[in-house]
Amino acid sequence: MQALKLVADHGELSSNNATTAASSAFVVQSGLLYLACSSEKKSGHISVCNTVAEAGIGSFHVEKGNGFLYRYGHPAHAKVTAVTKGATTVMTIDHVDTKIQVGDYVTMTGSSVGTYNSTVAHVEVTAISDPQSYNAYTKTITVDADTSSLADFTGTAQISKSVIARLAPETSDGCTMHVHEVNLA
């Protein structure tokens, strides 16, 4: 067995009955989760998705008292160099080769204007422009975030693909799942 290195501890998802539970949004760092199902309750199903409405799509069963290694995605990041404010937000990125796609959800970090970090937090990508000679080969990413009332963006920041984990207990006895993002050591 290959050793695992902890990248991030995303906490635990727990339900005392058959009600589903969802995590807060988290940035995809390695794309590999180690899930440990507590032996105190019953088994459960786990999925990683963009919204709580997608629960159960591509879910995996984890037996109580067992662990499960789950490759759920790949990291995707882009450096933001400019922002056009509005009811939707258009961000200019510094490199045309990003793995962020329309339909992904992203979170901004590192903005010197802190309200951008909290406003562009797990929001949907609605459009991506193609770099062409007429636009100096720049690429823009449009997200569903209203930044019209924020101060002007200055400096740089980063957007990263973000997701949520969703737990569906197997029975009305509930389930507790510990969620750890790992990398192979």
Predicted feature locations:
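Extracellular and analogous surface-interaction loops
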Residues: 21-29, 94-99
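Short beta-strand/loop motifs in extracellular/secreted proteins, especially
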Residues: 31, 41-46, 104, 175
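Loop/turn positions that initiate beta-strands
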Residues: 65-66, 103
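Small/polar beta-strand repeat architecture
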Residues: 74-90, 94-102, 107-180, 184
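Asparagine-centered strand-capping/turn motif at beta-strand->loop junctions
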Residues: 29-41, 169-171
